[in-house]
């Protein structure tokens, strides 16, 4: 197969399925051959990311990701994409394993926020406890001179319920709970824009988009970027040249 990209997924599987569905439905097609070429590694056995980030005595998820990246690197994909925000805890270590361009979903999303909402000084952040605990998005926002609003103590339990109880355990999206979280971040904490810092939250946005709030959806953004890059490379652009605009430092 020529000109394909590799997806490091399975964190969780339903969220990865959402990413794949987005790229398949958004690419303009007239025939089978117009779809994108990609290999999906749906490694559902990767240990819980938040558990390790908060407690290093828990299984380290780096080694599973390392094995997946090295295995795919042997096939020489045009670029890597990893649709899991919290897994970017090990982004630098994973990207260093290969010369293949490795997109940084969180960084790309933050730059999209700056581009789309240049006058906003802060953005509401809802994410896994792992991402919050290690300041993954907070640090990326600081790089571009923006602030993250995390809300009060009532926010994280609602986010955890939506991510873990509803989506990861039951495979459902509670529309009302998702909208309540967004409304609380907007009305109580003054967030004109809210960043969906977990791909399960991106799934919630896909399934329950009927609300009036501005969101930055990293999975939706990386899906569009994946399509853009894959088509440029298919049309003859060098992969490193194509990805250069998104390889933010």
Model region roles, listed by residue range:
Residues 1-249:
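Non-catalytic structural scaffold of enzyme domains
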């Amino acid at each position: 197969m020529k000109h394909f990209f590799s997806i490091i997924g399975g964190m969780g599987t339903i969220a990865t399925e959402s990413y794949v569905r987005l790229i398949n439905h958004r690419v303009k097609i007239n025939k089978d051959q117009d779809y994108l070429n990609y290999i999906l590694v749906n490694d559902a056995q990767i240990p819980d990311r938040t558990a390790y980030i908060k407690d290093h005595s828990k299984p380290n998820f780096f080694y599973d990701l390392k094995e997946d990246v090295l295995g795919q690197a042997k096939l020489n994909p045009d670029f890597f994409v990893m649709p899991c925000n919290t897994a970017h805890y090990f982004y630098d270590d994973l990207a260093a394993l290969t010369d293949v361009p490795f997109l940084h979903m969180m960084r790309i999303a933050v730059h999209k926020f700056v581009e789309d909402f240049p006058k906003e000084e802060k953005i509401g952040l809802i994410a896994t406890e792992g991402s919050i605990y290690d300041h993954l998005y907070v640090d990326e926002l600081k790089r571009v001179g923006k602030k993250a609003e995390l809300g009060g103590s009532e926010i994280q339990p609602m986010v955890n319920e939506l991510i873990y109880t509803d989506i990861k355990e039951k495979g459902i999206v509670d529309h009302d709970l998702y909208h309540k979280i967004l409304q609380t971040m907007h009305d109580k904490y003054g967030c004109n824009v809210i960043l969906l810092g977990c791909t399960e939250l991106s799934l919630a946005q896909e399934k329950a988009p009927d609300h009036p709030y501005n969101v930055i959806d990293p999975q939706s953004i990386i899906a569009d970027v994946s399509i853009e890059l894959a088509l440029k490379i298919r049309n003859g652009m060098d992969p490193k040249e194509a990805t250069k605009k998104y390889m933010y430092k």
